[in-house]
From Swiss-Prot:
GO terms for molecular function: 4 iron, 4 sulfur cluster binding; 5-amino-6-(D-ribitylamino)uracil--L-tyrosine 4-hydroxyphenyl transferase activity; 7,8-didemethyl-8-hydroxy-5-deazariboflavin synthase activity; iron ion binding. Keywords: 4Fe-4S, Iron, Iron-sulfur, Metal-binding, S-adenosyl-L-methionine, Transferase. Gene3D superfamilies: Aldolase class I. It comes from Methanosarcina barkeri (strain Fusaro / DSM 804). The lineage of its organism: Archaea, Methanobacteriati, Methanobacteriota, Stenosarchaea group, Methanomicrobia. InterPro entries: Aldolase_TIM, CofH/MnqC-like_C, CofH_family, Elp3/MiaA/NifB-like_rSAM, F420, FO_synthase_su2, rSAM. Belongs to the radical SAM superfamily. CofH family. It catalyses: 5-amino-6-(D-ribitylamino)uracil + L-tyrosine + S-adenosyl-L-methionine = 5-amino-5-(4-hydroxybenzyl)-6-(D-ribitylimino)-5,6-dihydrouracil + 2-iminoacetate + 5'-deoxyadenosine + L-methionine + H(+). This is 5-amino-6-(D-ribitylamino)uracil--L-tyrosine 4-hydroxyphenyl transferase 2. Binds 1 [4Fe-4S] cluster. The cluster is coordinated with 3 cysteines and an exchangeable S-adenosyl-L-methionine. Pathway: Cofactor biosynthesis; coenzyme F0 biosynthesis. [4Fe-4S] cluster binds at C67, C71, C74. Its cofactor is [4Fe-4S] cluster. Its EC number is 2.5.1.147.
Length: 384
């Protein structure tokens, strides 16, 4: 149990351990000594998931960089881009499998070509060729957009996606779950309630998802906290979230970031990043077991420090991350299993390779330091 409590009130600590943290408690913890918050979060982590730190050998596959959206935080979208063919997607999935991947994360933009049939063909093809690969794909926004193009309900779209072989839905397109914020940074996306409804429908259809928060732009501290509490309320109802992934906004090469920098505001500080990870652990205690410290946003060293602040997962090998790179990310696109093991052991913890659903898997090619030739290089697709 957490015992050093010189400034945190006893009732706040008691509620944290019971999974009853309030918004007022969270604000108080953030206003206090950050290292006391980190210690509390770290103890809650230990009591929930122990000392194992997980990671997944996976690959991002970006099927297109075209998008009709108008998100102000995006530096990846282009009107004249590529669309990968099914054959090219299968080639990338095959490269990933040879590198020991157990998951492919299929991502893209919103394009008129991408109706439900578009995604069904991709998912069915990948699953037929690589039945043991977990397919983690589509955001709530993509599901809504594709369902609309196909003239069907979100529920029917989710049913068909699951039947085709979709294993897990991404919890992206959440950004900040505040309609005030969304009208500024992503006015063309689904609103907060639509995101909640889509995620809830996915969980009820038997499709698990992760959850995300993209912070550090125009939102207030209270809006950040409200977002995490919304995640908690959904989890109380469905139990379908596997994790929370806090993702700091990268304010480079995009309109929102340009305005921020012009006003003298830059990316989040390391302390701010660690505080959000820690307070997320406190708020979500007993509900969402896994909190990820994403190395591609935080950098490897800060991600390692986050393991002492409530995080218990380092994310995936990725093999490519075009979205972060386009927004000025400088932490690379690939971490080998061997380096993950090194980082985790260096933090005094026990490494554990996992799959998308946080099930332990036997280490595959754990000593591979470099990706296979061709990984991280996106070919221009022919499907347009």
């Amino acid at each position: 149990m957490y015992t050093k409590k010189p400034t945190i009130p006893e009732d706040v600590i008691e509620r944290a351990y019971r999974g009853k943290c309030t918004k007022e408690d969270a604000l108080l913890l953030l206003e206090g000594n950050p290292f006391e918050l980190f210690e509390l979060a770290n103890d809650l982590r230990a009591s929930t998931v122990g000392d194992a730190v997980s990671y997944v050998v996976n690959r991002n596959i970006y099927i297109t960089n075209k998008c009709v959206g108008n998100c102000g935080f995006c530096a990846y979208r282009t009107e004249k881009g590529y669309i990968l063919s099914v054959e090219e997607i299968l080639e990338k999935a095959g490269e990933a499998r040879k590198a020991g991947a157990v998951e492919v994360c299929i991502q893209g933009g919103y394009i008129p070509e991408a109706d439900i049939e578009f995604y069904l063909e991709i998912i069915e093809s990948v699953k037929a060729e690589f039945p043991d690969l977990c397919i983690h794909a589509l955001s709530p926004m993509e599901v809504n957009y594709a369902a609309g193009l196909s003239g069907m309900s979100v529920e029917e779209a989710l049913h068909r996606l699951k039947k085709s072989g979709l294993d897990s839905l991404t919890g992206t397109s959440a950004e900040i779950l505040s309609d005030r914020v969304r009208k500024i940074i992503c006015p063309g996306k689904i609103n907060t309630q639509q995101w909640i409804d889509t995620i809830t429908a996915a969980h009820k259809a038997g499709i698990s998802t992760n959850s995300t928060i993209m912070y550090g732009h125009v939102e207030t501290l209270e809006e950040r906290l409200d977002h995490v509490f919304i995640i908690r309320e959904i989890q109380k109802e469905t139990g379908g979230f596997t994790e929370l992934i806090p993702m700091a906004f990268l304010p480079y090469n995009n309109p929102i970031g340009e305005k921020m920098i012009a006003s003298g505001k830059f990316s989040t500080t390391g302390l701010e990043d660690l505080q959000l990870i820690a307070i997320s652990r406190v708020i979500l205690h007993t509900y969402v077991k896994n909190i990820q410290a994403t190395w591609v946003k935080l950098g490897k060293k800060l991600a390692q420090v986050a393991l002492q602040c409530g995080a218990n997962d380092l994310g995936g090998t990725l093999m490519e991350d075009q979205i972060s790179t386009a927004s000025g990310g400088s932490n690379g696109e690939y971490v080998s299993p061997a380096e993950f093991e090194w980082m985790i052991k260096g933090a005094g913890r026990t490494p554990m390779q996992r799959d998308t659903l946080y099930r332990k898997v036997e280490p595959v090619i754990a000593n591979r330091v470099e990706p296979l030739p061709g990984l991280g290089k996106t070919k221009i697709g022919s499907r347009d």
